[in-house]
Amino acid sequence: MTHVVLIDNHDSFVYNLVDAFAVAGYKCTVFRNTVPVETILAANPDLICLSPGPGYPADAGNMMALIERTLGQIPLLGICLGYQALIEYHGGKVEPCGPVHGTTDNMILTDAGVQSPVFAGLATDVEPDHPEIPGRKVPIGRYHSLGCVVAPDGIESLGTCSSEIGDVIMAARTTDGKAIGLQFHPESVLSPTGPVILSRCVEQLLAN
């Protein structure tokens, strides 16, 4: 059974993620972000999920140190704050983008997002008369006030949403395919296809 270690960044969504991983058939172990990196590695995770949470990534316990130790070695899935940590680790800028809390919005897939197996068949704007033309709108649940507009080196944007500072990246992956980040919340009921997206992220990461 795939063992997912979930890093708890003190967020109310953490146990929604635990439930989502359990429903998908994964074993899930939770560690607070203050737990030493060596303790986390000793749990022998197949994949590490960096959870949502408040504030900025640099203030989230040992999360940045964990990324330093594991990126490229153990598959990483970052959600909301966890995604922002991956952005900052690669030198990207995470900044206030206007609060968006508890709303379903349409993420617009980039060309890379259209081609990604994570979002295959999930777009809602495919025209019945032209099914050969891929859709780009995927409904997702947004709960955030920070975001990134420009993907740093090593990060490829998969989808964006509009914000006060421009189109913020809502889904991304590292160019080596070893990490995926989601600014939105796949574990939220506001993400209609969230469970599918979450499972596909795990599948893609484990396949690389």
From Swiss-Prot:
It catalyses: chorismate + L-glutamine = anthranilate + pyruvate + L-glutamate + H(+). Its EC number is 4.1.3.27. InterPro entries: Anth_synth/Amidotransfase, Class_I_gatase-like, GATASE, TrpG/PapA_dom. The active site is at 80 (nucleophile), 185 (for gatase activity), 187 (for gatase activity). Transmembrane segments: none annotated. GO terms for biological process: L-tryptophan biosynthetic process; phenazine biosynthetic process. GO terms for molecular function: anthranilate phosphoribosyltransferase activity; anthranilate synthase activity. Keywords: Amino-acid biosynthesis, Aromatic amino acid biosynthesis, Glutamine amidotransferase, Lyase, Tryptophan biosynthesis. Disulfide bonds: none annotated. NCBIfam families: PRK05637.1 (NF004169), trpG_papA (TIGR00566). Heterotetramer consisting of two non-identical subunits: a beta subunit (TrpG) and a large alpha subunit (TrpE). This is Anthranilate synthase component 2. The gene is trpG.
